[in-house]
């Protein structure tokens, strides 16, 4: 199995398959501008793993590959496309919510208007800063 990257019109994708013959998994993402926070984030447009290949960690592998590539871009978080999580879809497909929750996403709800709520699943990028160890070296010229 190989993971290969596909870029088309600002939409990026990682696909996992057998030598580009049979696709068994895919994650598709794009840039998203959040006007409230005035920051760019990643937005997952699609996430797919073939039914016979589920429960083997392929979804986690695709998500980790996406996160590793985009950590250097200073995105604060990643969201799942909000239209996916409308009230009707969440009631009908509880497993979709559980899958994203298992991968580390959490459900947020913000009020856009008094009558309309904006639902999304969010994954925060938490980068642990490594402590730098400074090596104290003796000056070479002090021995001369």
Language model feature labels by segment:
Residues 2-27:
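Conserved beta-hairpin
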Residues 70-92:
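Conserved GNAT acetyl-CoA-binding A-motif
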Residues 49, 55-69:
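Conserved acetyl-CoA-binding loop-helix of GNAT-fold acetyltransferases
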Residues 63, 93-99, 112-119:
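Short glycine/proline-centered loop/turn elements that form peptide/ligand docking sites
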Residues 29-30, 49:
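GNAT/GCN5-related N-acetyltransferase fold signature
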Residues 84-109:
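Conserved active-site alpha-helix within GNAT-family acetyltransferase domains
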Residues 130-133, 137-139:
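Positively charged N-terminal leader segments that act as targeting/secretion signals
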Residues 38-51:
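Conserved acetyl-CoA binding element of GNAT-fold acetyltransferases
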């Amino acid at each position: 199995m190989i993971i290969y990257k596909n870029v088309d019109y600002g939409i990026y994708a990682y696909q996992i398959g057998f030598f580009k013959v049979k696709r068994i998994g895919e994650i598709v993402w794009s840039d998203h501008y959040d006007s409230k926070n005035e920051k760019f984030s990643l937005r997952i447009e699609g996430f797919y793993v073939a039914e016979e290949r589920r429960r083997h960690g392929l979804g986690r592998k695709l998500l980790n590959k996406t996160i590793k590539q985009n950590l250097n871009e200073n995105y604060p978080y990643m969201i799942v496309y909000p239209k996916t999580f409308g009230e009707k879809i969440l009631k009908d497909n509880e497993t979709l919510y559980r899958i994203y929750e298992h991968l580390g996403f959490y459900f947020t709800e913000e009020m856009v208007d008094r009558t309309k709520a904006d639902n999304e699943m969010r994954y925060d990028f938490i980068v642990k800063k490594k402590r730098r160890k400074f090596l104290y070296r003796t000056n070479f010229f002090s021995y001369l």
